[in-house]
Amino acid sequence: MHQKIVECIPLWSRNLNSNVKGMRGEGIACLLIVLCSIIYRTEAQRIETNFNNNWHFILKDSPDFSKENLDDSSWELLNVPHDWSFEKGVRKGGDQGQGGGYHDGGIGWYRKTFSFSKASLSKTTYINFDGVYMNSEVWINGNRLGKRPYGYISFRYDISKYLKVGKNTIAVRVDNGLEPSARWYHSCGIYAPVKLVEVNPTHFKPNTIFIKTPSIEKQQGVVSIDAEIKGAFKGLKYNVELLTANGKVIATHSEKLASAQPSVQLEVKPPKLWSPESPNLYKAKTQILDGKKVIDEKTTTFGFRTVAWKTETGFWLNGENVKLKGVCEHWEGGPVGGAWTKPMLRWKLQSLKDMGINAIRPSHNSTPPMFYDICDEIGLLVMDEIFDGWHKKAPEDYGKQAFDEWWQADVKEWITRDRNHPSIFVWSLGNETHSDVAPEMVAFGKNLDPTRLFTSGAGNPEDMDIQGVNGGSETKSFIENNKLTKPFISTEAPHTWQTRGYYRTQTWWRDNELSGTYELPNLTEKEVFFYEGINPKNWKNRKQRFNSSYDNATVRVSARKYWEVMRDTPWHSGHFRWTGFDYYGEAGLVHGGLPFNLFMGGALDVAGFKKDLYYFYQSQWTEKPMIHMLPHWTHPRMKKGTVIPVWVYANADEVELFLNGISLGKDKPGTVWNEMQCEWLVPYEEGTLEAVGYINGKVVNRTSFSTAQQPSKLKTSILKLDAEGSFTDSFIVTSESLDTAGHLYPYGENKVYYHIQGDVKKISMENGNPIDPTSRTKSDFRALFFGKTRTFLRALPEPKEAAVVTAAILGDKALYTSNLITIDAQHIQLLGKSKTSDLEIRYTTNGENPETHGKLYKDAFMVEDDTTVKAIVKQNGKTVLSMEETFGKNEGLFWGDEHSADMWIGRGVDISAEEGVLTGAAKPSREAHRFKGSGFVDFKGGEGSITWYQENDGEPGDYSIRFRYMHNNHGKLHPMKLYVNDEYVRTIEFEPTGGWEKEWKFVPTIIVLQSGANNIKLETTGESGPFIDELFID
């Protein structure tokens, strides 16, 4: 292999011909020149190697695990991305608590052995990690490289001096021993790609290429490219080429390198602008050359677009006033925890884009680089966010552990890594946090990128360029009385909840109806739907219910109303709804804790199934004709004639509704919030309900529901996500329950079993059910949830063949509609040639083993109450699945009636404030109305505290509590510190309730109670307190 040795004399040497004899003689001088030599291979100036495969992992801790020579053959062999917490699953008492969906933390180690050639030793070699959560430490051949506390940042180490010819070993320790370290579910481990980068000693320093577009006109765009070169020496050339996305060269520049920090400008005529509608991209190829030989080459994607913010009119993109139609999205939102591959991540983001969004806020942390690459490509504007808090928010989070020491290093990595992405339109420094460090952070960030403005989600708005407001932006008072002094964006709104397939006609407010909310009336005088996931008699608190899909379950405002407000308010730049996908964690705040383990605020559930809300946004934000109807038309326990609100979301001119072929009239979608859906009140009768959309009088689309009978067969569909970059194909296997006529049975809850074969690995099984305790990774089944479930698979490296056998014992779990049971099994080829597959089913209904006593299944059969059906599936004579399903009147969903509409009334524990221990200015009072007990506590403008005593006869764990309060001090929140058993928990804020006489409201939160005695204290913080009436423990 050809090699070249070049004398290393820095460009900044004052005398390039100076004699070095005076140092220690000519021999030493020659030695110095040799040591400073640059050796490079012209055939491969930059080599990036996929380092994702063949890691050994163990969930234990020992200092010996860092050693170079260690027998790790018994450890688990896996590929990254990897999330051990997700793989372990939900556990009562899980380390991450309710905020983390009861998942665990722990300490884990990864080790990887690789070979290195003699020729590569002359290179500079980096190991790049795109994301490790958290407190990672890295060793190479037993040599410690360093520690990176933050779990949501990329980093790298130069490992050159520790490498050797032959075997080398990387060891990574990941420490999540202190939990909870986030307020939502977080991954644990190496959850993002890893790569090895070999470059010549003279190379572009990481993250130093900075592409700006200082001038963009219709016919000409100027591109400015800055770079920083490590190991520059005399005689080098610097080349820049600009290329279109398909590789056509459109501009070039070449110069002798006169500085280690070259800066050049080129022109593009005319530039194609980047936007969500037309995400036009360009590439800049930068090269360092010695003569004609390329020493280093880097290709960077960029785009042309202009961004402007105006206080009166909001956000402007490419000279057009644009509303930001966005979602907040946790990295972990969706079905795989934090271990996303690029094909799966593209599916996730494209699903959101297809809903009609044009913007996304990764909440509340930066994400791996592939996220921004995809947003560039598909056209999603990104509010790029770095931190949740600038101090402690979760008990053991980054704000507590490392922020003060590490924020500058993390902000530098974040901005210099991401600043070339055209999708990123604003930087966000934090979320619902406050600190004197904010001005310093803004100044530090602007030094790294002067081309973008800074905001935060309700953090130090006075120090930000753009005022970001979270939930407070949903209130009438904010919208109607706001006097802005700077541009505004709603960084987190609206907050609505919805469970796919579940409906209620009565409005649900998370914290009871707050003052200053927009109207959201009930859809019917009385409730007409009475099913639940849990029998209310078994609820642990009043929150353990599902939420309606009618867009009538919220904190302050419906999705429809907030879109109207945003659309029609000129200064309102747009919103980022909470959230796009459902996510694991924060299960206590809204739903009272276990068995709930996830948050249902998304427009898609964690399995990626689209909720009705998804189609509302699609009807408002997309132009391709669409139509969607709700609810379904299968209501087996409903009285005939019960009036059901039927809604249709459509972007048609008008919609006509038919029931059993008879027209029920036409309706036109309106622009006012409660007219955005077409609506009919339809007396229920079995049959077919059909909606037909018209544009200019012509039918453009139609949708229908037919009343389904008991589930009798499976519908299985496969979505293949093509391999991309270093990642293999992924597959989404969707199973649905159908009746014999092929209609979806919308209450399907039977278990679907999966036998995975060949060169694929099961990543997750998910159905969107917030109370399903089944392991998502270790079980071989997942129950249907309202008729649907999914399995997510990833192909192994170099796959050849793969298949899946799916099977289910199908029927009405409660045997209400029918006692007829069907068993269905299917073989589906994923990769390779389809093979003959003979499937045989044997079953029993008397508890006996179907392997030895099973009857050959030929046709559907009847069962009695409280029967367990056991079955096996044999493939070509070999048993591949063992199944069982229990049927009976006490199985499955809870079905109630008008008497069970709210069975929680009268339950729980309420403790009057005046009966607690009062200190300071806190005094009992009766000078108001509608208080509970003998009075309430009035702080009379002073400082003090209330302490309640509670004997917990139940198990220790998370409990939902509410404080009943009242005040009318507009603009004040009267923050009070909450302590439980003398441990600070959080600060509670009390919004004005609208009066001082009888306008009592509740503010909820979650606390941990121990068994036995507990003390709960509220203490003022210098701003006095509201009237406090009682503490209610749900």
Swiss-Prot record:
Assigned keywords, A-Z: Cytoplasm, Glycosidase, Hydrolase
One GO CC term, this protein: cytoplasm
The organism's place on the tree of life at top rank: Bacteria
Enzyme class label: hydrolase
A family per Pfam: Glyco_hydro_2_C
E.C. number: 3.2.1.31
GO MF entries: beta-glucuronidase activity; carbohydrate binding
Cellular localisation: Cytoplasm
Listed InterPro entries: Beta-gal/glucu_dom_sf, CBM6, DUF4982, Fn3_assoc_repeat, Galactose-bd-like_sf, GH2_Domain-Containing, Glyco_hydro_2, Glyco_hydro_2_AS
One record GO biological process: carbohydrate metabolic process
Up-regulation conditions: By ulvan and rhamnose.
Gene3D superfamilies in the cross-refs: Galactose-binding domain-like, Glycosidases, Immunoglobulins
Residue ranges the record marks as coiled coil: none
Catalysis performed (reactions): a beta-D-glucuronoside + H2O = D-glucuronate + an alcohol
Family in the record: Belongs to the glycosyl hydrolase 2 family.
Role summary: Glycoside hydrolase that may be involved in ulvan degradation. Ulvan is the main polysaccharide component of the Ulvales (green seaweed) cell wall. It is composed of disaccharide building blocks comprising 3-sulfated rhamnose (Rha3S) linked to D-glucuronic acid (GlcA), L-iduronic acid (IduA), or D-xylose (Xyl).
Protein name (record): Putative beta-glucuronidase
Organism encoding this protein: Formosa agariphila (strain DSM 15362 / KCTC 12365 / LMG 23005 / KMM 3901 / M-2Alg 35-1)
Organism lineage string: Bacteria, Pseudomonadati, Bacteroidota, Flavobacteriia, Flavobacteriales
